[in-house]
């Protein structure tokens, strides 16, 4: 059963204060670290700017959507993100879930 992660993030003042050369070096490290993720079955479904024109839009500037074969694979990615120092530079929230269908989701909502 696939598992999913949605990230929402915005560069913070610490990131904005870095010279471009340091930002580039940091992002090169991220690129290198991400190169082996596909071998673990980790898929990037989307990385990009958020669309502020949608109803109830998030104030976050960027989003990432990921699919994982197991929760353990998801946790490997999250541990790598944390270890990289990413959270020092970006205001960031994560939302994770496994696969679910409409009927089970509606039943869960009804019980809340």
Model-derived features: where do they sit?
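Conserved short beta-strand edge segments in small beta-sheet-based binding/regulatory domains
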Residues: 86-99
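Short amphipathic alpha-helices in soluble, non-transmembrane regions
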Residues: 75-84
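Charged, amphipathic alpha-helical segments and their flanking helix caps
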Residues: 17, 84-86
């Amino acid at each position: 059963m696939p598992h999913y992660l949605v990230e929402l993030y915005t560069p913070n003042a610490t990131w904005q204060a870095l010279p471009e050369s340091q930002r580039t070096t940091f992002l090169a490290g991220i690129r290198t670290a991400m190169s082996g993720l596909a071998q673990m079955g980790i898929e990037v479904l989307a990385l990009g700017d958020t669309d502020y024109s949608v109803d109830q839009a998030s104030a976050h500037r960027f989003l990432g959507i990921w699919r994982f074969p197991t929760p353990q694979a998801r946790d490997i990615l999250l541990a790598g993100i944390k270890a990289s120092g990413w959270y020092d530079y970006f205001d960031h929230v994560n939302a994770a879930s496994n696969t679910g269908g409409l009927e089970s989701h509606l039943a869960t909502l009804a019980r809340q």
